Each structure stands twice: as C-alpha cells, then as structure tokens.
Amino acid sequence: VRIVFGTDSDSALTRAVLDALEERGHEVKQVAAGEEWPEVGRAVARAVVSGEAERGVVCCWTGTGVTIAANKVAGARAALCTDAATAEGARRWNDANVLSFGLRLTSEDVAREMLDVFLSTEPDESERAAISRVEAQS
C-alpha cells in the first residue's frame, strides 16, 4: 500500500511508526517534514485525495490540529483515533482515508495496532450511501 506520512514532530514514536510501515512492506513517503501542523495535515490529505498515496497517516501532539487541517481538503476523511477498535471502525463504517493520532498519549504498541487494522480493513459496502452523502458535502 502506498502511504503518505506526516508529522510536525520528530520523536521516537514517529520514527517507530515509519519503521513499522516500512517493515510491513508499505511504500512510504514522508511529506511536510519540518512544517507546522496545518501544513502537515493538508499535505497528507492532498497526497491521498490526488491518488499519490492510497492512505495517509498524520500526527501532532494531540492529533486534533492535523485532523482538522486534513479534513479541510475536499475528499479527505481523516479520523482521530486512540485505539485499534476506533481505527478499524473508521475504515469499516466511514471509509476514513487518513489515520490521525496524538503523540502525547499514544504508545508505540497502540500505534502499531492502529496501523495494522487501519491498513488491513476495507469499508463496509452497506455504508456506501452514507459515505457518499458525506462526500457530497465537500
């Protein structure tokens, strides 16, 4: 899977996330390195919406800022997740295309669990009509 990754902080967790993605065989591109959260969120979302990447992963201290910025891009569906069940539901029921999380409270193990389910879960086709209504609002 082609993944675009962005963060406004270089930390042990962000490096572990990049390592986990690459270890799992994903093609990973990091964008907006060194930029602040508004640019990071937008850059990740634009890469996903344009088709440059299939999914995005974005993080900042709380995860809130990058999520808001990403969701300003038409066609982006960024979901701020705190655990694997939420990440799975975001894909299954909402067809989220960007996984967002905060660096403040997310452990490396939880980040890896969220990545695994977010990248392996497909949308539930019974939700397609609802997802289309959200897309029409863009």
Model region roles, listed by residue range:
Residues 27-38:
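A short beta-strand-loop structural module common to alpha/beta enzyme folds
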Residues 40-69:
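Short, structured active-site "lid" loops
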Residues 2-3, 52-56, 75-77:
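Short active-site oxyanion
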Residues 4-6, 10-13, 17, 84-138:
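C-terminal binding/interaction regions
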